């Protein structure tokens, strides 16, 4: 089997049976991988930009609030999605309760996104909400980074993805993990030609990583959004880097969609 076939994207899609850590379960139709393995539970309101994407009420990907009308996520989370079935939950760390539910009127994926055949380059999409969300201590936009984090920087990633690479268990509460930025030259030593300039790589080590369900979620440095969870090597948390969308190279796309300049 080629190296490419060992890649996974970090989204939960329908047919996979997911078991909450409190014993509840969700059934999805097909399985792709993405979760936080080896992370810790976030305090309520500590990550106010984090959102949960729902399809017919079921959580399947993460995202980040970037304006009061816009959510950024991974394009592989929303290919051909029926927006009448899509909602965004903001303002809560729980998958079971709290927060606000928002409808979506438009999904815009990057025009250069192709998918797996192009190694998930430009894996970014922006959701336009049906109504403006109210900024509170529990839900607020995060600034978009215009420069990349330095090599070796500690980055914060968060999500509700699977807790263990060998299990379908997912948390009911938001998890977070500190990972380390690495340059693409070093990243290519492991992930090879699949790593492009539009990818940003980070890792923590064996036993700690993003996984199924974390797709589209935020990668943050110094309070700015530097990346979006995109893809990694299977199994999760095997000690190799994961690939994120490099936000500093997505600014033109973002500005076209949201209709305003990103602060430089």
Language-model features: where?
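Extracellular "complement/coagulation-type" protease architecture
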Residues: 2-264
